[in-house]
Amino acid sequence: MSIAKKRKGNFLKYFLTIISCIVIFTGIGFGTLAYMTPPPPKPPVFPQLPPVGAVSAVLMDGNTGDIIAQKEGELKIYPASTTKILTCIIALEEGREKLDADAVITPLAMGQDGTNIGLRSDMPISLHELLYGMMLVSGNDAAVSVAETVGGSYGGFIQMMNEKAVSIGATRSHFANPNGLTDKNHYTTAIDMAKISRYAMGNPAFRKIVREKVYPMRYRSGVYRNVENRNEFLSNGYRGANGIKTGMTMAAGECLVASAERDGQLLIAAVYDDENRWKDVEAWFDYGFACIRAWEKYEQEMAGEPAVYKFMNQLTGKESSWEEERKRHY
């Protein structure tokens, strides 16, 4: 064999070897290995906000304090018995050393108008037990007794209420009594009441009181009375319902501050002068939880799956993973 022929044969052998390697590594014909980044997620799609019949309403994220929805949330309104939310949290904080002591029962307390639990000076009861009578069945007499026991005097407690409201950030409110009976100097806003409620729900003892469906309120004599919570979300089993207070007067209309928690996410709704308060708050709770789910899904997608290598076959135009191509050719 001539040297020229031998060189030609070797060149052909080397050439075919190189071509084979190229074919193998490019997926039989002209493929490219690309670093493919997943497309950005679509913006979250939120449901439509349901209308409510309330004159003033707010839906708050109980974890962050953010306002999710509102309707005239800063409108000046009468709070009615939702006032007792503030009365209760002050009693738990400032009167914690008096919780086991006898509550002060005066003629002023026993003479309150509206809903009462029937306090009597000859039937002593502890401050702790009285809080259930105030929050579950909305005893106006109980609220005054709580105020006089904790504040040292009626006026002293009213001062405590206004100072506490300001410290919480409820700066558009002014309180003139501990139970919410109508007074021109006793007013708030739905947003302020949501702020106060969020603050109160941060106290475990407060949460324990307002989530009770029925509580055996005991007098010192050993006699007890079952007091039932007027919160229909608790009795009807709305998912996650855990508080907090109803209210109603002629001036305020039907009022409700309610809370619900799912998977660690707390929502607080406050509606004032709303004849359909239960239906409206339920609709807003459903809306709020749906919005949170949509946002959480979006955040998860934003975090994204890690980018992966993709093999693009230039002949077929089809895309496959590098792992699939490796298995196919090796």
Q: What do these predicted regions represent?
A:
Residues 17-30:
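Hydrophobic membrane-insertion alpha-helices, especially the h-region
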